[in-house]
């Protein structure tokens, strides 16, 4: 088996590529610590609420705070990291002014799953620091998803998995999306899949149907067509899947296809969506597109969105290309 270290040694020794590799290595090392804490569960006193809200107005779990602090400490110590932005913190944290990279992360996606031993994960996005030599500020992070140098996630489930992709400009070996599994015997992430591709068609979809009454008409139409099955306009039966953690649903799509949807709804008309553009939608969109899928906010490509705030929210439809394009067509025609 090829370890993560061996895999990275096969890449060209270009300065920017090596900097990105070093940052990904730092993140995966923290992921091993989070994996150990999750395995201990209640024995490590990581269950339950932390007793505070994050900037999103969400109740923080104890492990939300722990994972955030571990990542923040490790990344600010990395010489290549000029600044860090976390879903859990109001503002970006400056790190090393001479660093050439910015890192955004969701320290523990799906943290409501912690106490019931269901999948959670860490999502990350790496951007260039275009004001090298100056302290990183929130505005430095406001780059389109197309500017990402790399993105990925760590999934903490029955096994710990790492999936990531380098941008086309850095992926000299043309390996697209790659996936590693943590070997508990060696403590090393080992390569299990590369050049992952997503089928353009699917029979599986992931959406929280409890919000159906709040969806916009085009989304209601789309899901009703799927529910009609083989006797409806789609002429085939679909299955619903829902992990309650974006990282788990995207992992399933990379492994066996499907479409993931967290649409805009009318519960709070002032919000464009539920998920965060910079910490969740952009990194997952890069992964999905590099695997041959598509990603949209139901009207436009997510990675073309011009961010105005590091905590900006967005609707998300991603996965099987033909399904995503059909959802977008319904919304554009509405």
Swiss-Prot record:
Q: Name one GO molecular function term.
A: fructose 1,6-bisphosphate 1-phosphatase activity
Q: Does the keyword Kinase apply?
A: no
Q: Name one GO cellular component term.
A: cytosol
A Pfam family of the record is FBPase_C
The EC number on file is: 3.1.3.11
Q: How is the cofactor bound?
A: Binds 2 magnesium ions per subunit.
Q: Indicate where this protein resides in the cell.
A: Cytoplasm
* Residues given in the record as Mg(2+) 1 binding sites: 87, 106, 108
- CDD domains tied to this protein: FBPase
Coiled-coil residues are none
- The UniProt record gives the binding positions of substrate as 109-112, 208, 274
Q: What positions does the entry give for Mg(2+) 2 binding? A: 106, 109, 280
User: So which cofactors does this thing need?
Assistant: Mg(2+)
Q: Which GO terms describe its biological process?
A: fructose 1,6-bisphosphate metabolic process; fructose 6-phosphate metabolic process; fructose metabolic process; gluconeogenesis; sucrose biosynthetic process
The reaction(s) annotated as catalysed by this protein in its Swiss-Prot or TrEMBL entry are: beta-D-fructose 1,6-bisphosphate + H2O = beta-D-fructose 6-phosphate + phosphate
- Family, as annotated: Belongs to the FBPase class 1 family.
Question: What is said about its interaction partners and assembly?
Answer: Homotetramer.
Protein name in the entry: Fructose-1,6-bisphosphatase class 1
From what organism does this protein derive? Psychrobacter sp. (strain PRwf-1)
């Amino acid at each position: 088996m090829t370890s993560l270290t061996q895999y990275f040694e096969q890449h060209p020794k270009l300065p920017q590529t090596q900097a990105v590799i070093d940052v990904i290595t730092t993140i995966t090392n923290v992921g091993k610590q989070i994996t150990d804490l999750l395995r201990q569960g209640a024995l490590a006193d990581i269950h339950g609420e932390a007793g505070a809200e994050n900037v999103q107005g969400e109740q923080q779990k104890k492990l939300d705070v722990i994972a955030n602090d571990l990542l923040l400490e490790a990344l600010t110590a990395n010489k290549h990291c000029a600044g860090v932005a976390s879903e859990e913190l109001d503002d970006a944290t400056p790190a090393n002014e001479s660093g050439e990279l910015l890192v955004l992360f969701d320290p523990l996606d799906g943290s409501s799953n912690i106490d019931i031993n269901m999948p959670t994960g860490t999502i990350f996005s790496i951007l260039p620091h275009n004001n090298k030599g100056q302290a990183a500020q929130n505005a430095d992070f406001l780059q389109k998803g197309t500017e990402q140098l790399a993105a990925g996630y760590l999934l903490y489930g029955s096994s710990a998995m790492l999936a990531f992709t380098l941008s086309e400009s850095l992926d000299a070996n043309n390996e697209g999306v790659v996936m590693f599994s943590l070997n508990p015997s060696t403590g090393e992430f080992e390569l299990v899949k590369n050049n992952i591709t997503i089928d353009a068609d699917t029979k599986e979809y992931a959406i929280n149907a409890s919000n159906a009454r709040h969806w916009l008409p085009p989304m209601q139409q789309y899901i009703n067509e799927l529910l009609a099955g083989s006797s409806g306009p789609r002429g085939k039966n679909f299955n619903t899947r829902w992990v309650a953690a974006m990282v788990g649903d995207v992992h399933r799509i990379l492994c066996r296809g499907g479409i993931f949807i967290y649409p805009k709804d009318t519960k709070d008309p002032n919000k464009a969506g539920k998920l965060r553009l910079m910490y969740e939608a952009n990194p997952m969109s890069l992964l999905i597109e590099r695997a041959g899928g598509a990603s949209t906010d139901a009207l436009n490509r997510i990675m073309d969105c011009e961010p105005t705030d590091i905590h900006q929210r967005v609707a998300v439809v991603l996965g099987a290309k033909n399904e995503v394009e059909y959802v977008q067509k319904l919304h554009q025609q509405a």
